[in-house]
Amino acid sequence: VSAVGDGNHSLATAKTCWNEIKKTLTPEEAAVHPARYALVEVVNLHDDSLKFEPIHRVVFGADAAKMTVALAGFFKDIFIAPKPPKDIAGRQVFVMLSNGNKQYVSVTDEKSNLTVGSLQAFLDEYLKKETGTVDYIHGDEVVERLCKNPENIGFLLPTPAKDELFKTVVLDGALPRKTFSMGHAQDKRFYLEGRKIR
């Protein structure tokens, strides 16, 4: 099975750039222009060198008490406590951070096959009604630092299992935005350095 992932909007950006450049070219120039092609990397999903990393969420300008009440209303079978549940079988578990407090949130009435999808469904609904903006953050330490501010609420997500990827696409369709990252953020400088094509 082959799959195409559009990480960091790479393919969408490449297509948009190409369509803009193409307008300035003759058909002969367009036929041989390097921007016509997207650089891709073919990898084996199960290769040990390919590491999945979670992409966490931080909601800026939010109220922790309102967020907790909203979580309890959105998920019907929910457990929120300062310690992780002893038995997590059949549960999706993530961590909520606010003002130095850590709460473990576990649910059984998941909205997606992946924990990140269930949380994203909640955040999408919550932010339709309440104030705040969400950002997608790499690294536990960064989330913990941001959530020392009492107006920020962070959600630490588990690393998605590789064997859940295709199953989730079958069950849920498209993956939620920013589901996972392949590698650590500090190792991905090439995204910034490899953008310019003339």
Sequence positions of predicted segments:
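Surface-exposed, charge/polar-rich loops and edge strands
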Residues: 1-198
